Amino acid sequence: MKVAVLGAAGGIGQALALLLKNQLPSGSELSLYDIAPVTPGVAVDLSHIPTAVKIKGFSGEDATPALEGADVVLISAGVARKPGMDRSDLFNVNAGIVKNLVQQIAKTCPKACVGIITNPVNTTVAIAAEVLKKAGVYDKNKLFGVTTLDIIRSNTFVAELKGKLPTEVEVPVIGGHSGVTILPLLSQIPGVSFTEQEAAELTKRIQNAGTEVVEAKAGGGSATLSMGQAAARFGLSLVRALQGEKGVVECAYVEGDGQYARFFSQPLLLGKNGVEERKSIGTLSAFEQHSLDAMLDTLKKDIQLGEDFINK
């Protein structure tokens, strides 16, 4: 099993690479790519960690050597948020980066499962889909927007509020991956209940958690370490499913049947070919239903922006 991390010299990429070097199954290969010349050195640094995961780093304009034979590609390349920016302010730079990298994936490892971490995810996933489609290699079961950070934040905040162990809580999060499009289904957590006010406040905190980190870092970056953890969790789940493990479920932002929007984050059963089944979002509370209805316009506009970037 070969996993490639694109954007591996950045804050998320290095954290993700460290976790994968430690946690990928024995015999796996990990390849790191970034435009930055430090990348081969990041791989050498990680290569000293005593796990049976082979690692190699590549830098420069051409990601091809890192992508050859990859089963899973995780893309974290791009610029990070600074105070006062929202995820959509990143669009102008990151759209071009994602387009370029996905074009290289389409040529070199078109059958790989691709996880997009680069923000704004609502839009960059649509860009990736259109690039793959133009190249004639798009498989909607193999392209994912990684929204796992919203899930792990939800798990943490719910556990804190309700005095639970974070490992005991698993919150499904649907919709998209920015602002109002992030919708934690707090009503579906077994054995935990919330007042209407608690649900509204907690939902808002989860939606704005990225900004909480950006502001706390005072201009020094955005959420890199927790995002590295989230991306590793998703990547490792994908690897386990690709290797035949049954019953692996994660939420991610994928193209579905278009019931809510062309791309939508929902619980997915993962399997040997990527998405095996898009699971139902279940019964929503009145607050959740209202939030879902209210966000769809925003989500659809985000998606349209990505489609237009490639097609216009």
From Swiss-Prot:
InterPro entries: L-lactate/malate_DH, Lactate/malate_DH_C, Lactate/malate_DH_N, Lactate_DH/Glyco_Ohase_4_C, Malate_DH_AS, Malate_DH_type1, Malate_DH_type1_bac, NAD(P)-bd_dom_sf. One of its GO terms (molecular function) is L-malate dehydrogenase (NAD+) activity. GO terms for biological process: malate metabolic process; tricarboxylic acid cycle. It catalyses: (S)-malate + NAD(+) = oxaloacetate + NADH + H(+). The keyword Oxidoreductase applies. Changing residue 187 to L: In strain: ZJ-74. Homodimer. This is Malate dehydrogenase. It comes from Salmonella paratyphi A (strain ATCC 9150 / SARB42).
